[in-house]
């Protein structure tokens, strides 16, 4: 199953050099903390619509493959993050199978829980980078995060109703 917002997310083109961003854009796109928490700070109830979840083969990755270890399988989770029922963000998380051991096995059990609620409670979370991308008028970002040193890739597309615009 797919969703039009996830098609747009996969169409993001990333800037080779960090673009100059006005403060409202940079405040959202370069946020180091939880996007879920940021949405909740807007006074919104955040919910998850789960679109896809399960293992994919390496061949299903596009340019993401260059940012992750070479493995045969990856855990994929694609969601829409809603604020008071309105879609604000499309998210795609790709987790190498080798990351899914120990406490990180919980990444497969999130269900309707926003990823940020899990990630940002971990004292072992680090971020390698944030890449800024754009598809027509929509902005997005991609980050390689690490839990206990183990990588995962998170891509987020800000939808038209989000406060970024």
From Swiss-Prot:
Subcellular location, principal: cytoplasm
The keyword Cytoplasm appears for this protein: yes
Claim: Lyase is one of the keywords in the record: yes
Enzyme nomenclature, EC number: 4.1.3.40
Catalyses which reaction(s): chorismate = 4-hydroxybenzoate + pyruvate
Subunit structure and binding partners: Monomer.
Function: Removes the pyruvyl group from chorismate, with concomitant aromatization of the ring, to provide 4-hydroxybenzoate (4HB) for the ubiquinone pathway.
Name this protein carries in UniProt: Chorismate pyruvate-lyase
Organism of this sequence: Klebsiella pneumoniae (strain 342)
